[in-house]
């Protein structure tokens, strides 16, 4: 062991006999494993300085979506001590119509009860897809999930798994999108369709279809068609004064227009941009 850096802490805050200080060694960047030692306080935990210090944390954060997969067996080969048998494989009943049941398995659990909802999932998926678009070089095909090694970035494989659940939540006849799957004491309810969920669905599926077309054009087109059907159903039942729905509608129209170039979606973009209130990021 050898001393590689010496310095003195600077007082940040002082209240009575208590002092809060910090040490700044930002100008020291040599890779390695170190600890800090100070009189009275002793040694700190060891820490690393490296250009790749966050790599393992980033990989594990991305893999949390795999651990949260619903409706499939997670083997120990990929899940380790988080392995479990397939869950929530039974039918869910439609809230308000107990005689109607449907398969709502799949996707990602969003809480400890295994519940799932379209808008919450859309927010998560959109952040992941935006990150992938901006920094594609950071996403590999070797993150340790069953799809690893298929020549498709694993983050897109993971999002595709979630889109499979999205497609289950869309009514094949009307294009309506059920809002989610909520647990109760005897099973789970499928929540009724609503415009907000449909616009969120449309935005997410269009964006994924756009990104995925170079890997699987047929599935990408399936997603894009589903987005178009959801949007068209949503505009029939949206509430005129619902601000959040307007934001989702704008985002959905933008993504469908980007992916498919359909001129009919321009009017929704122009309408929103002409409204004067361009607040978006804080609501999405």
Residue ranges and their predicted role:
Residues 149, 153, 173, 181-237:
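A conserved hydrophobic secondary-structure block that centers on an alpha-helix together
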Residues 1-52:
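Ligand-binding face of N-terminal immunoglobulin V-set domains in extracellular IgSF glycoproteins
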Residues 107-120, 186-198, 235-247, 272-284:
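Solvent-exposed loop and edge beta-strand segments that line ligand/cofactor-binding
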